[in-house]
């Protein structure tokens, strides 16, 4: 969670720096005054993200008397790239489609509650995401314009490999909410954005016929009722 806070702090610092730069331009000239009047906006983004997986336990106890708890002990930043297709509805609202790819991994720790046994598993993912969002922009203040954004993000894991202990589903859908700033530079718009994504479905595969002959590995899945995902995403759009 500390890394997430650092990302948010870095976003605020970068936004403040961008605001100072925009104010410098504000005192001289209004950059790209008709940019927001276009019906379509195209662009791309690069960024980073951290993901978290939350486990709901059911109190399962193995025949040996073991009770296992699973958690994600740390966060590993991932990398993401997106395209941008923005359809203007009116002066304040637009609809965005930002397909992209996310590359990352998550470490999962399995701990025996009453003993000192510990197992670990690294879950690597390559997501194809298809976010559709509604963007609300406030009034432009010279060369800066804040906005809010929200929507849904279907995600498909195309790089998922067979897992020894846990196996996650290849698709999920996220509810997204975020905010950002349009900074109008002389030749393009720079748009830093912070987005929070909340997985809506159980991503744990409960039916594991591949482990029918290895119940010692299946016990981790048996210990869980469900698993849900969350993401915090920091992106920089160029329009």
Predicted ranges, named:
Residues 143-146, 162, 166, 188-191:
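Short conserved catalytic/interaction loops centered on acidic-Pro-aromatic/His motifs
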Residues 1-27, 236-239:
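Bacterial Sec-dependent N-terminal signal peptides
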Residues 22-76, 237-239:
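Short glycine/proline- and aromatic-enriched beta-strand/turn motifs that initiate or cap beta-hairpins
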Residues 31, 36-40, 48-54, 84-160, ...:
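Gram-negative (and chloroplast) outer-membrane scaffold detector with strong preference
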């Amino acid at each position: 969670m500390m890394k997430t806070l650092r990302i948010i702090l870095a976003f605020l610092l970068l936004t403040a720096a961008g605001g100072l730069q925009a104010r410098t331009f504000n005192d001289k000239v209004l950059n790209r005054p008709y940019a927001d009047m276009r019906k379509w906006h195209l662009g791309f983004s690069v960024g980073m993200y951290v993901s978290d997986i939350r486990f709901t336990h059911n109190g399962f106890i193995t025949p040996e008397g073991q009770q296992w708890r699973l958690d994600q002990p740390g966060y590993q930043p991932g990398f993401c790239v997106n395209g941008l297709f923005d359809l203007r509805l009116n002066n304040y609202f637009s609809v965005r489609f930002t397909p992209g790819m996310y590359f990352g991994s998550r470490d999962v720790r399995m701990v025996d509650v009453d003993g000192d046994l510990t197992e670990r598993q690294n879950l690597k993912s390559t997501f194809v995401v298809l976010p559709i969002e509604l963007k609300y922009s406030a009034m432009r203040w010279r060369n800066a314009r804040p906005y809010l954004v929200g929507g849904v993000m279907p995600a498909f894991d195309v790089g998922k490999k067979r897992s020894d202990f846990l196996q996650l589903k290849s698709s999920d859908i996220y509810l997204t909410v975020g905010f950002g700033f349009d900074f109008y530079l002389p030749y393009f718009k720079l748009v830093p954005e912070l987005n929070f994504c909340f997985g809506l479905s159980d991503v744990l595969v409960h039916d594991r016929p591949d482990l029918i002959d290895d119940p010692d590995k299946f016990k981790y899945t048996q210990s869980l009722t469900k698993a849900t995902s969350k993401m915090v995403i920091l992106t920089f759009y160029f329009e």
